[in-house]
Amino acid sequence: MSFTFLNQLPTPAQIKEEYPLSKELTELKAKRDAMISDVICGKDDRFLVIIGPCSADNEDSVCDYVSRLTKIQEDVKDRVIIIPRVYTNKPRTTGEGYKGIASQPDPEKAPDMVEGLIAMRKMHIRAIAESGLTCADEMLYPENWGYVEDLLSYVAIGARSVEDQQHRLTVSGFDVASGMKNPTSGDFSVMLNSVYAAQHQHHFVYRGYEVETSGNPLTHVVLRGAVSKHGNTTTNYHYEDLIRLHEMYDKMDVVNPAAIIDTNHSNSGKQFKEQIRIAKEVMHNRQLSSDIKSLVKGLMIESYIEEGSQKIGEHVYGKSITDPCLGWEDSKKLIYDIAEMNS
């Protein structure tokens, strides 16, 4: 048999009981969820900025980073809603490399899933408590959702997961904003089919139960660029891409058509400084076209305390150990610029 069963994992209920979210923070999350929902549904003209490290590898530096966003959020509260990006699960192109704190709480030690699930939950609770901001994470493993479902205000489904039926069906049971990235091929129809699937009711098996879901009307798309059959990166954040997406949305039987633009990954060719220019181009195009303005509800930006990236083991505080990120000063200025352009 090719599986070796190492540990029986605690259930989500057991982890939640050991590390509960306080009543005060539960109420804060409900308020934040409602604000974000209003943006996705077109009831609130504020703009979403989903910003943070490529991977949330270290609790202290991640929570330090998230807490720095608090003052900026207060300054831009009339124009922007900041959603810290705290990604505890990382997809890997080849399956090798650091897979996130949920799998490997210490990047320099062996994987430990039990400690990883605890570390994931503790980090999210601490980030909310210290910053007053509820966060975004990627749902890489649908069965892990239960460990953080009471903590997250935004969930992303990655380019490699968006075609998977279990991801689509699981999102249909969420009650928070959920972004479906375009697949690495760049196919808009695949992405929109995922939105359609997640917005509708389903009957399936989840964590050992037969379940029914009601559909998630807050499911939308995330444009992250693509990779051609020749291995070249292609972008999909330009004016003509957004107009095409708007036209395709019009033909779909979905509600709340919305898009978030991922400024990194294939849109930047992983040239992290390009995120600044890309963000401003998207904001400019929103000013040029009412259709684009109504469609594009936010940006996704990879940012940390120190710019660039490092190898595991170099121990530079607040510097990414996965994809390179914008540094703090550039990030801070960019958020203020985005707020100014959302007029």
Descriptions of predicted regions:
Residues 1-41:
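N- or domain-start disorder-to-order transition segments that initiate the globular core
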Residues 25-38, 42, 72-83, 89, ...:
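N-terminal beta-rich core of secreted/periplasmic extracellular enzymes
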Residues 40-43, 70-77, 125-130, 213, ...:
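Acidic (Asp/Glu)-rich catalytic clusters
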Residues 48-61, 323:
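Conserved phosphate/anionic-ligand binding catalytic regions in large, soluble enzymes, centered on
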Residues 52, 261, 327:
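Conserved, mostly hydrophobic/aromatic
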Residues 304-342:
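Internal helix-turn-beta structural module
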